[in-house]
Design a protein with these regions (language model features):
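Cyclic nucleotide-binding regulatory module and flanking cytosolic helices
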Residues: 1-31, 71, 76, 81-85
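Glycine- and acidic-residue-biased ligand/ion/polar-headgroup-sensing regions
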Residues: 33, 44-57, 72-74
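Short phosphate-coordinating micro-motif centered on Lys-Gly-acidic
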Residues: 36-41
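Short alpha-helix-to-loop micro-motif enriched in aromatics/charged/Gly
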Residues: 61-68
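Cyclic-nucleotide recognition modules
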Residues: 69-125
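Polybasic "coupling" helices that flank or enter modular domains
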Residues: 97-98, 115-180
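Phosphate-/nucleic-acid-contacting segments
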Residues: 147, 156-219
Length: 219
């Protein structure tokens, strides 16, 4: 499918707006591990995922990563164009978790269209509200939810995303998602293994008892 089939506001644009987007649209194919947007140093533009998977995260003062949210097929990201919205001061990094095909609407192009089009402006505000709701939910998880519950939730989310109970993932990767240390995650996973919830092997975690993980995350 083409860009217009993915962009939810295409039919709300006039002919001139459609042309300026088409003339300036950037298509990128990025490999897993590619940094697409790097904090306030970049004003990349609005991202629209055609296929693949992106991860949006922040860095603590100590250099620890924590995932804010992920982007999948047909998802849009505005934080990569936060320079066009003065009230947003959010230093996020966006990385490809898998090989990804995406489109980029340059920030200034999107800013001009947002000024002209009420539907685009309204949609932008709704999308930003949704993303900040995601971030507030994450803060609540970090503040009030114990690490064992957060690890259980993450493992269950991964099995849903990947469609398998055999996860090819490192302890370091989990630590980066959850804003923790690798050693802490390793101890927690070994505890899970002792309890019969998972089986650990090099670069892989096999989920053995998803029901008990679900019970743990809800407790």
């Amino acid at each position: 499918m083409n860009f217009e089939n993915y962009f939810p506001l295409w039919n709300d644009l006039n002919i001139a707006q459609k042309k300026i987007i088409s003339d300036n649209l950037i298509t990128r194919d990025v490999k897993k591990g590619t940094i697409i947007h790097n904090g306030n140093l970049d004003c990349t533009g609005l991202l629209l995922v055609k296929s693949g998977q992106l991860r949006t995260y922040i860095l603590s003062d100590e250099g620890r990563e924590i995932t804010l949210y992920r982007l999948f097929d047909m998802d849009m990201c505005l934080l990569s164009a936060s320079c066009i919205i003065r009230s947003i001061q959010f230093e996020v990094t966006i990385e490809a978790e898998k090989d990804t095909d995406l489109w980029i609407i340059p920030a200034e192009i999107y800013k001009d269209i947002m000024k002209e089009s009420a539907p685009v402006a309204n949609y932008t505000n709704e999308l930003m509200a949704t993303r900040f709701s995601d971030v507030m939910w994450l803060i609540e998880q970090i503040m009030w939810k114990s690490l064992d519950k957060r690890v259980a939730s993450f493992l269950l989310e991964e099995t849903s995303i990947e469609g398998t109970n055999e996860l090819k993932i490192t302890h370091e990767t989990i630590a980066n998602h959850l804003g923790s240390h690798r050693e802490v995650i390793t101890r927690m996973l070994r505890y899970f293994q002792d309890e019969g919830l998972v089986k650990l092997s090099r670069g892989k975690i096999t989920i053995l008892d998803s029901k008990r993980l679900e019970t743990l995350q809800r407790s």
